[in-house]
Design a protein with these regions (language model features):
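N-terminal alpha-helical scaffold/docking segments in eukaryotic complex subunits
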Residues: 1-64, 167-171, 182-198
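Amphipathic alpha-helical scaffolding segments comprising HEAT/armadillo-like alpha-solenoid repeats
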Residues: 2-5, 26-40, 61-77, 103-116, ...
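Conserved hydrophobic register position within alpha-solenoid helical repeats
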Residues: 18-21, 51, 91, 126-129, ...
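Solvent-exposed loop and edge beta-strand segments that line ligand/cofactor-binding
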Residues: 41-43, 80-86, 119
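Residue-level signature of alpha-solenoid helical repeat scaffolds
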Residues: 53-57, 92-97, 128-132, 165-169
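Ordered, amphipathic secondary-structure segments that act as subunit-interaction surfaces
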Residues: 84-94
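Boundary/linker segments of alpha-helical solenoid repeat arrays
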Residues: 121-122, 156-163, 174-190
């Protein structure tokens, strides 16, 4: 399958959210993962989120010894460096989803995510990734969450909401009550749609 045909096929798969078709695609795991990386920067929010989900689905389906997953994670980490010249704003979410589906890779990569909670423009994405990992049974080191409450009242609703969600998942209680309610757009993996979350 030519690269353009593969790209078009994956876009169709993401549109339909057809993970069986993703598995049957005539391409190597690395080729599919690299193509999905492109869709994480798509103009459409729903396509981006489904690409994130698909990265986890495909990573889980590959054999543990397949180096393609590690290479893609390292590529996402590189896209969070200014030197890359191609910042991928949803790189933390992609890494978090892959690690949620691949517990064997968490010791190698999960500890890298907390540092991005204070790194523009990845703060909210890093929080989402840590929430995803916590929901998958991998809690962040409490020391890495110090200062999280400073985001509870952040003017950006997503950052405020995700910081509160992460604190709840980590069992951290706010030092005071009275933070105003927030709502923000989030991806619902149970339905494959975007919805308002709190």
């Amino acid at each position: 399958v030519r690269r353009r045909e593969r790209y078009d096929a994956i876009r169709d798969i993401l549109t339909r959210r057809d993970w069986d078709a993703l598995e049957k695609l005539p391409a190597t795991g690395g080729q599919i993962l690299r193509a999905l990386m492109l869709f994480v920067q798509d103009n459409g929010a729903l396509v981006r989120w489904r690409a994130v989900e698909a990265l986890g689905v495909k990573a889980k389906a590959l054999f543990p010894e397949d180096r393609a997953v590690r290479e893609v994670i390292r590529s996402f980490i590189w896209t969070m460096c200014d030197e890359s010249g191609n910042l991928c704003r949803m790189a933390p979410e992609a890494i978090g989803e892959i690690l949620a589906m691949r517990p064997d890779l968490r010791p190698e990569f999960a500890h890298l995510l907390p540092q991005y909670m204070v790194e523009e423009p990845f703060e909210s994405g890093a929080m989402w990734a840590l929430c995803r990992l916590a929901e998958a049974g991998h809690a962040a080191d409490p020391d890495s969450l110090r200062g999280l409450e400073a985001c509870f009242g952040h003017k950006e609703p997503r950052r405020a909401g995700l910081s509160r969600r992460l604190a709840r998942l980590a069992g951290l209680k706010p030092s005071r009550a009275g933070y105003p309610p927030v709502s923000f757009e989030d991806y619902d993996p149970s339905t494959g749609t975007l919805k308002m979350a709190t």
